[in-house]
From Swiss-Prot:
Full protein name: 3-dehydroquinate synthase
Entries under CDD domains matching the protein: DHQS (cd08195)
Assigned protein family: Belongs to the sugar phosphate cyclases superfamily. Dehydroquinate synthase family.
Residues engaged in binding NAD(+): 72-77, 106-110, 130-131, 143, 152
Disulphide bonds in the chain: none
GO biological process, one term: aromatic amino acid family biosynthetic process
Length: 359
């Protein structure tokens, strides 16, 4: 088992990475001072695959698990379904000592964390991410949110989990498209932080795409190490943590304007990374060779790199102006200076951004 730690003082927690460890979660939770009542938040597909294994493990140790299901999909990560979960918790009699488990991908993790942060002014929860994207990104760091029709993740909190429990065997059931989508976030870590990791991904592309378990554990661990280091230094995104938003300014706009139905999150982020790198190159920072490397690795892993054909640049710009990184109406983005080095919260003119979007 690989063990990492996110250092945040009293809110520090472990990330545990292994194979076939879902059946051990009940034993692990005995270490926490919690009541016996545990809510498992999941979707029907994931619950059918892994729910009973988690339930049996919890019951074996004397816990009382309750399952709350929400539909699968980004467009269900909204206040209506958060309210539904809150209602269920109240009806089941959950109190401040109760505990939540997010069993699923990024949508489940985000909405579970959000509910945990506001239910009775905050209860504990753990992340059991079952998608690659959630394992390397959204399960770590304590960002929680639900979407709003005007923008993604606009309503949210910072609420750290008590534990992140990763079983790479869950990736066996992950649809290929979702697996590839998760690789966008993995590649992002190489671009923003670690050139050697970027090169490792280039070299081991075939093994990664074949889902070699040892390689998967290796890349998940390195991605989590990078995110844990960043979050430990800047929990609430006052400066450094913004680096993790590379690709997300344009990516989130794509998701919003397509109604979260045309692109998976990683696919939109891939397009965002390419065009934010192109913007950096146009401004004279990122050299052409590094831009081509970023574009090529994403393309070679099977990720999209081009904007939707009918995407209106004016609508994109209007959506980007609502981005959380902006201050006083000024667009601030994270753009690569070189592979492994970034410019954080760099101010971009609307004119330059539209130029890149229209190319």
């Amino acid at each position: 088992m690989e063990k990492l730690r996110v250092e945040l003082g009293e809110r520090s927690y472990e990330i545990l990475i292994d194979r076939g460890n879902l059946s051990l979660i009940g034993e692990r939770l005995l270490r926490f001072s919690i009541s016996k009542k545990i809510g498992i938040i999941s979707n029907p597909k994931v619950s059918e695959l892994y729910g009973q294994k988690v339930i049996s493990s919890l019951q074996k140790e004397g816990f009382e698990p309750f399952v709350i299901l929400i539909p699968d999909g980004e467009h269900y990560k909204d206040y209506f379904w958060a309210y539904h979960i809150l209602t269920q918790l109240l009806e089941f009699g959950f109190d401040r000592g109760s505990f939540l488990i997010a069993l699923g991908g990024g949508v489940i993790g985000d909405i579970t964390g959000f509910v945990a942060s506001i239910y009775m002014r905050g209860i504990s929860y753990i992340q059991i991410p079952t998608t690659l994207l959630a394992q390397v990104d959204s399960s770590v760091g304590g960002k929680t949110a639900v979407n709003h029709p005007l923008g993604k993740n606009m309503i949210g909190t910072f609420w750290q989990p008590s534990l992140v429990w990763i079983d790479v065997d869950t990736l066996e059931s992950l649809p290929e498209r979702e697996f590839i989508s998760g690789l966008a976030e993995v590649i992002k870590y190489g671009v923003i932080w670690d050139k050697e990791f970027f090169e490792f991904l280039e070299i081991n592309r075939t093994k990664i795409l074949k889902k070699d378990k040892d390689i998967l554990i290796s890349i998940i661990k390195r991605a989590c190490e990078i995110k844990a280091e960043v979050v430990s230094k800047d929990e609430r995104e006052s400066a450094l943590r913004a680096i993790l938003n590379y690709g997300h300014t344009i990516g989130h706009a794509i998701e919003t304007l397509t109604g979260y139905s045309s692109y998976l999150h990683g696919e939109a982020i891939s397009i965002g990374m390419v065009h934010e790198a192109k913007l950096s190159s146009m401004l004279g920072f990122l050299d052409k060779e590094d831009f081509e490397k970023i574009r090529n690795i994403l393309k070679e892993f099977g990720l999209p790199v081009n904007l939707p054909i009918n995407m209106d640049s004016s609508a994109m710009l209007k959506t980007i102006l609502l981005d959380k990184k902006n201050i006083e109406g000024k667009i601030r983005m994270v753009i690569p200076d070189s592979i492994g080095k970034m410019k954080i919260n760099f101010e971009i003119s609307g004119e330059d951004l539209k130029k890149v979007l229209n190319e």
